[in-house]
Amino acid sequence: VTRALVTFGVTGMEELLELAQPGLREYADRHGYTLLTEPPLALTRPPSWHKITVLLEALDEYDEALWVDCDVMIADSTLDLADEIPAESWQAITAHHTPEGEVPSAGVWYLRQPMQPVLEAIWRLDGYLHFKWWEQGALQELLGYTPHELPVHLERETELYRRTHWLGLEWHTLGFPGRPLDPGARVVHCAPGNPISVRAQLMRDLTPALKGA
């Protein structure tokens, strides 16, 4: 099985990618992934949407792909996320329990070949082009969730939902300034939704602790 670890940083987020990259490279080398960090050639939509295009390209060349946002840090690389995913699953993601409901998140997103037509379907749902969660709203709709109806909840179980493996939050822990890091965290999403400078500072603050893990 060939696997790619995919991310990119554009429109001011290059610094975040630079901070994340050492941990991503160590994880990729340890578990046999090819690290892909090239941005899309042209931004025709808000940047977050272009994870769809780069993942389609990755799945043309590799059997499986792991996407992580560029403000994600690897806290513990000893285990490979892929080992937890059942063979029958098409994808693996987390759902975060938030004041806005149960929100599936693509900040850490594992995909297999059957996800190619799903990615194409997400791209076609351009009614979410400027939605607050960007392409994640389209993914949530295809899963059977209600991104436009708060609190977000599962309305119906779709085929995609049944083919989804729900990761434990240790694989996508949300980290924020002033909040202790969960000692079981393996992958930390650093202050998502905050200004780039806040995310970068948290990533810099976490780096010494993660190196000592």
Q: In which residue ranges do the predicted regions lie?
A:
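Generic beta-sheet signal
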Residues: R3, A65, A92, R186-V188
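Catalytic core and acceptor-binding pocket of nucleotide-sugar-dependent glycosyltransferases
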Residues: W49, T53, Q116-A213
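Structured loops at beta-to-helix junctions and adjacent beta-edge loops in soluble globular domains
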Residues: F8, A95-H96, R112, E170, ...
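GT-A fold catalytic core of metal-dependent nucleotide-sugar glycosyltransferases
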Residues: A42-L43, P47-L119
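N-terminal anchoring/stem segment of glycosyltransferases
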Residues: V1-Y62, P208-A213
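Short, glycine/charged-enriched secondary-structure capping and boundary segments
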Residues: A20-Q21, D80-D83, M203
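A structural signal for short, well-ordered beta-strand segments and their strand-loop junctions
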Residues: L36-T37, L66-D69, A92-I93, V152, ...
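Anionic group-transfer/hydrolysis microenvironments
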Residues: G9, D69-M73, A191
